[in-house]
Structure formats: structure tokens, C-alpha cells
Amino acid sequence: MPRALLEPLKRLLDESLYEARVVGGAVRDRLIGREPNDFDVVVVGPALRLARALADRIGGFFYILDARREFGRVVWRSPEGRRFYVDLTRREGASWEEDLRRRDFTINAMMVDLDAFLGAGPFVPFDPLRGMEDLQAGRLRLCAPDAFHQDPVRILRAVRFEAEFGLRMTTETEQALQEALPGLARVAPERVREELVKILMIPPVVRSLRRMETLGILPEVLPEVANLRGVGQSPPHVWDVYEHTLRTVAAMERLLGSRMASPEWYDLPPRWAEIEAAMAPWWERFVARWEEEVAIDHPRRALLLLAALLHDIGKPATRTVEPDGRVRFISHERVGAEWAAHRLEALRFSNDEIEEVEVMVRHHMWPHGLAILPQGDRKTG
């Protein structure tokens, strides 16, 4: 399928005599045996003009992402409905190596020419920063010491790449991340949102959430969730609200069919098998529903995980202790729904997404209320 995108681009470049390279994630993915669906192409020439011409030639859509940097995107949907992206940008710096040194991580700082990427020559990337060596060693390393400061959204990408490729940040990378953390506040909310959704889609998601907390990222992105730490609850709860929340996310991930085991699954209640058995006859219909996109590249499964993550954020503000020592959170679901909506608005989620999550948080106590009713009192309408 990349040929349907890159061969027309190759012809455009041949016609215009501009030089270009495929760089970044597509090169990395090809090296580890993955078939990419997005391609970064660096051009020594007018990248926006080429992007517009490519979109016209293949029947795709063209967007300007950064006019000053000559950064454009082409989006194309295959006959099977799969979405592909080609990002074209003008080369920064006087050489290919200088351009690579301005990128985020060494694993994304490898490039090949279009002929090699399309199979017309040996696939031997230009790799001056030893990104392939880091990929094989499981290291996540910055291209430059100030890479996080240059673009703080890379802080979230670091967590995502660790989870997606089984990497670990080097000590120097972690130190640089800590120093750059305050810069997350100046990142456009839409960019934070996109990284958060991508993290939610990589199982086991709780591992990434714990990593975000350890690194101090969670309070910067979802302070309402970070504030759940240490908020105690009465029996039958055995964890504080924060740990309860993470285990709810893990349970939701299993409910959604994740095949990558999460350590939190070992503490699921005995009746969990009954729940899964009850769902089995309708499994295909459930999956079809979960995979529906509520917004571009945002399937409903991501919103279900997000709702699980936010479902109890109203508890700290509603916590009371009865004379007998019992802890209560009256109307926490209503308060939590309002706060969840505010947080998602701040992150520029769509109105449809906000409504779905808000409804789930507001009504998350209903199944419990129905379950504890005597059988004869359960009514359906």
C-alpha cells in the first residue's frame, strides 16, 4: 500500500528534480518488520507545493501544518478504508545529518531515499546517530540534549515509544525530561490530546500511566487523576482511589479484548469469568462498536479507557467521614462528570467525545445500583 502513495511522490520529485528522503518512524518500522501507515518525507525544496500536488494526484486531502517551516500533510484513504498519512517538510539545516540532529530520538533519526524505501535498492538507512543500535539495545535516547525543550510534547512521546517498542529511556534522557517538564504547559492542547489517545491505545495502558506518574508527567496532563493518590476509601474497597482507578482501567482493557496481560488482572474478582461469558454471544457486535471512530483516529475503545481513568475524579471533593468511620463520596459521579467534561474541553476533544465520556462518568454507579436491587425490583423500560 505505501506504493500507492510514494510512487506518485517519486514521479513528482523526478519531474521537479528536488531531492527527498524518507525519515523517522516509517524507516524505524520497516527495520523491525512493521508496515507503516504514516510517512515523513524531507524535501530539499518547496514541500508545501509538493504536498498539494501529491494530494491532487492521488485524490487525497492536503493540510498545512506549519506554513513557516513548509510542513504539509497529505491524508489518503485506501479502498479498504485504511487511513494513510504523508508528511512533507522542507529540510532544516545545510545537510541531511544536521536535519536528523534536530529530531526527537535517535530511533527516529534514520533516513533512506525513496528508491530504497520502494525496494529499488538496498535498504541501508543513513544513521549517523546510531539509532538502529539503540533500537536493538532497547534504549530511548535523545538526538540532542535540548530536544525536550525544543518541543516538550516529546515528553509524552517518550512514554509512548517506551511502551510501543519495549524501550527504556537512558539516564540522560530521563534527566532532560525532568528539566523540561514545565514546558508541557505551553504545548498546544490538541497535541497533548493526540499523544494521550495514542498512549491509551497501547496495552497494557496501566504500565504507561504508572510510568507517567513516576516521571511527574501525570499531574501536568491529568491533574485530577494524579490528585486521587492517597484518597482513602471504606470497605469493600481495599485500595485508595488512585489504585482503584488504575485497576478499573486495567479491567476495562481486558473487557475490551486486550491480549497483552496486565499485572492488575490477577486481582480481578471471581465473578469476572461470568461477565466475560455473558458477553461472549455478542462479542463481534461489541468489538464493532468499540472500533467505531468517534473522531478521526479516536476509536470508541479509547474513550471507554478514558472514562475508566476519569470515573472517580469527583471523589476527593466529595469525601466525607461518618461518625462510625465510614467514608462516603455522595454525588461524586455528578461532580466527576463535570470535571471530566472540563478536562476534555481543555484538551480540545470533540463535543461528541466529551458527551460520551461525561455520560459514562455521570452514570457509572448505575450498574452497581441495579446489581444490588432485589431481583423483583429490577425493571426495564
Annotated model-derived regions:
Residues 1-381:
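Catalytic cores of the polymerase beta-like nucleotidyltransferase superfamily
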